[in-house]
């Protein structure tokens, strides 16, 4: 059966193509002789670039077209950045593999300033993420936070043209594109709690495709799977998408999982934080329990207001 060609559905951005080539390499390293080809496509999130992500709305903004290719048999697997993967999947599809996680932190990128704390009052900082925006505004209410869309290269070009004094990007994305020299510093989780699944690559396929699932099995990284499971369980309970002010980050120390999370008002006026420690085998339960705690402490009201202020187009 190794004469079968495995087709990877992927977005066309440089970062998405890097991730698809990465999975292609892993598959061929684990299964010598296997033919793997890429099927690049454009998603709705790639097309609508003149509107803030929160207002574009809709869960699965960057994955629906890829999932349609799976359902129609035009591709065998879809490779996603885990922070873009919705909490629910179309019938017949599922997330079957999570590859080893890269650095999940946010990156502070600036030409003239080495640290967020060095930015003068009134400096303009670019990010499209409500999660990043609320944490920035809490820490530095004197800054001007402006939306920033486009792929990594486009965002860096806007910084270089002087439209922003600093921008916030993902460390993993910059490293994968060979742009780590642009990182002034990686922001610790205490300063900017990462997004759910940030830094991890996930693989989706048809659940009845046992041949492909067997090929993918060696690519799954158990530690990453447990960490992301806790983060996604929390996000699922909060009914969050990838365009809401929710942060969640799990670390594993031996068999003990440490899960931190936050829900914040986009203006930074209120951020509700919580954490849990427990056996890694209870990762999903911990995520649900932490979400319930945040909801009981006011997260429900914050999220309701976010959805009201940013109705999907």
Curated annotation (Swiss-Prot):
PROSITE patterns recorded: PORPHOBILINOGEN_DEAM (PS00533)
Cofactor binding comment, as recorded: Binds 1 dipyrromethane group covalently.
Pathway: Porphyrin-containing compound metabolism; protoporphyrin-IX biosynthesis; coproporphyrinogen-III from 5-aminolevulinate: step 2/4
The organism's place on the tree of life at top rank: Bacteria
GO BP of this protein: protoporphyrinogen IX biosynthetic process
Record's keyword annotation contains Cell division: no
Name of the top EC class for this enzyme: transferase
Reactions performed catalytically: 4 porphobilinogen + H2O = hydroxymethylbilane + 4 NH4(+)
MF terms in GO: hydroxymethylbilane synthase activity
S-(dipyrrolylmethanemethyl)cysteine modifications at: 242
EC number(s) from the headed UniProt entry: 2.5.1.61
Cofactor(s) listed: dipyrromethane
An annotated GO cellular component: cytoplasm
PANTHER family in the cross-refs: PORPHOBILINOGEN DEAMINASE
Note: The porphobilinogen subunits are added to the dipyrromethane group.
Subunit structure: Monomer.
Name of the molecule in the record: Porphobilinogen deaminase
Native organism: Yersinia enterocolitica serotype O:8 / biotype 1B (strain NCTC 13174 / 8081)
Gene: hemC
């Amino acid at each position: 059966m190794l004469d079968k060609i495995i087709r990877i559905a992927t977005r066309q951005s440089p970062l998405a193509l890097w991730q698809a080539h990465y999975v292609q390499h892993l598959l061929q390293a684990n299964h010598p002789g296997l033919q793997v080809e890429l099927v690049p496509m454009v998603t709705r999130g790639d097309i609508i670039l003149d509107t803030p992500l929160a207002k574009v709305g809709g869960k699965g903004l960057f994955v629906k077209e890829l999932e349609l290719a799976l359902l129609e048999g035009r591709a065998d697997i879809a490779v996603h950045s885990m922070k873009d993967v919705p909490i629910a999947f179309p019938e017949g599809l599922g997330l079957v593999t999570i590859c080893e996680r890269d650095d999940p932190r946010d990156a502070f990128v600036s030409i003239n300033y080495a640290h967020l704390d060095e930015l003068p009052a009134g400096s303009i900082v670019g990010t499209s993420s409500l999660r990043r925006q609320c944490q920035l505004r809490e820490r530095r209410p004197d800054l001007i936070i402006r939306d920033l869309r486009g792929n990594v290269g486009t965002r860096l070009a806007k910084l270089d043209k002087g439209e922003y004094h600093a921008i916030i990007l993902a460390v993993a994305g910059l490293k994968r594109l060979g742009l780590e020299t642009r990182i002034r510093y990686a922001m610790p989780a205490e300063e900017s709690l990462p997004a759910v699944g940030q830094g991890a690559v996930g693989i989706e396929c048809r659940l009845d495709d046992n041949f492909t699932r067997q090929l993918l099995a060696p690519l799954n990284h158990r530690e990453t799977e447990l960490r992301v499971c806790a983060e996604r369980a929390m996000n699922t309970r909060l009914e969050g998408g990838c365009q809401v002010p929710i942060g969640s980050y799990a670390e594993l120390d031996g068999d003990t999982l440490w899960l931190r999370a936050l829900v914040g008002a986009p203006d930074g006026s209120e951020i509700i934080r919580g954490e849990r420690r427990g056996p890694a085998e209870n990762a999903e339960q911990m995520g649900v329990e932490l979400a319930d705690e945040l909801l009981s402490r006011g997260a429900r009201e914050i999220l309701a207001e976010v959805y009201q202020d940013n109705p999907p187009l």
